[in-house]
């Protein structure tokens, strides 16, 4: 659903638009720009009330260029790009972009029992594409993991799924886990772990559709 927005007109006064929130469930709310037509003094959004998936941009009164994201995901610049956000207030003593240029270094700042308690979880918003999957791929250096440490990738929804490398009994394991953020009826957490030969660097990928 799309709701909770504001009406705006273009500088030339010939077009009306609305910026609204699109509720996509567990993926959150996305800003959504839709054209507006007036019928009998009532604003009609999109195509007779149905939002457009794509449409021409508003007339802004000036030439505009397509603006990609101002930064990329390679961790080669400081500070972090605007597409990143911490899930909690971070422990700034336990992460760095400067100690190893081109890498985000994370240290274990505390031992916790649940993923939701991990402070230095760096996230990006998942985009709800209708016809293609959203995908994230990470490159991890796990050479310095200590007993009990986890490092990996997660689709942080409710329920969530994670794929990680952990050290247990001085051996690296590849772990997949699905669990909930809150108590849900008729849900049983699942976990699979397998001891595998892992070098210093591993690639992990998560996909959601």
Tell me what each language-model feature is.
Residues 1-209:
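Carbohydrate-active catalytic/glycan-binding domains of CAZyme proteins
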């Amino acid at each position: 659903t799309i709701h909770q927005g504001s009406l705006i007109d273009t500088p030339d006064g010939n077009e009306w638009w609305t910026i609204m929130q699109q509720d996509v469930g567990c993926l959150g709310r996305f800003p959504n720009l839709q054209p507006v037509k007036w019928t009998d003094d009532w604003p009609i959004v999109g195509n007779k009330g149905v939002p457009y998936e794509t449409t021409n941009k508003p007339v802004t009164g000036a030439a505009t260029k397509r603006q990609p994201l101002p930064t990329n995901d390679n961790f080669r610049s400081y500070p972090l790009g605007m597409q990143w956000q911490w899930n909690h207030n971070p422990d700034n003593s336990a992460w760095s972009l400067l100690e190893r240029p081109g890498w985000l270094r994370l240290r274990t700042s505390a031992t916790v029992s649940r993923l939701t308690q991990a402070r230095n979880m760096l996230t990006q918003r998942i985009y709800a594409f209708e016809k293609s999957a959203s995908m994230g791929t990470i490159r991890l250096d796990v050479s310095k993991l200590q007993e009990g440490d986890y490092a990996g990738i997660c689709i942080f929804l409710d329920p969530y799924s994670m794929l990680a490398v952990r050290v247990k009994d001085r051996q690296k394991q590849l772990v997949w886990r699905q669990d909930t953020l809150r108590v849900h009826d008729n849900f049983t957490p699942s976990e699979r772990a397998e001891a595998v030969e892992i070098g210093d660097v591993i690639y992990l990928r998560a996909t959601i559709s």
